Amino acid sequence: MTKTITPSSQGLDQKWYVIDATDQRLGRLACEVAKILRGKNKPTYTPHMDTGDFVIIINADKVAVTGRKSTQKLYRRHSGRPGGMKIETFEKLQQRIPERIIEKAVKGMLPKNALGRQLFTKLKVYPGPNHPHQAQKPEELTLNTIPNGDK
């Protein structure tokens, strides 16, 4: 009889990946990043454990959306005070805080519990091409989020 083996937390090797978001589609990029953060790309995937890897996303200010989403997609936040709702379009948020767009997209694709919050801390997003994680020796990961290979 075979038994299911649960990996120990010490035996997991967590890699670092760097992904360039230039001209990548937002939703497709976020989906792939969420899979890597959860560890679904590994044979040791366990739903209740953090078996995923660290992901660094660079050039977050150059992420693309299709159609009219740049003017119609809205991001809402609330201060907690009466009348404190702030609404911002994709374009304005991309000019102001471009990394928040990718963070919100990926966070929405992670579990809504303590594990999801822990996984989210392994995502590092930077608006430009530079990041401070060279010491971790991240691997370059190329994702093709453009359907039919356009561009």
Swiss-Prot record:
Keywords: Ribonucleoprotein, Ribosomal protein
Name of the encoding gene: rplM
Polar residues compositional bias, start-end: 142-151
One MF term in the entry's GO annotations: mRNA binding
Protein's name according to its UniProt entry: Large ribosomal subunit protein uL13
Residues covered by region (Disordered): 126-151
Organism encoding this protein: Crocosphaera subtropica (strain ATCC 51142 / BH68) (Cyanothece sp. (strain ATCC 51142))
Gene Ontology cellular component annotations, sorted alphabetically: cytosolic large ribosomal subunit
GO BP annotation list: negative regulation of translation; translation
Function: This protein is one of the early assembly proteins of the 50S ribosomal subunit, although it is not seen to bind rRNA by itself. It is important during the early stages of 50S assembly.
PROSITE patterns, per database record: RIBOSOMAL_L13
Lineage: Bacteria, Bacillati, Cyanobacteriota, Cyanophyceae, Oscillatoriophycideae
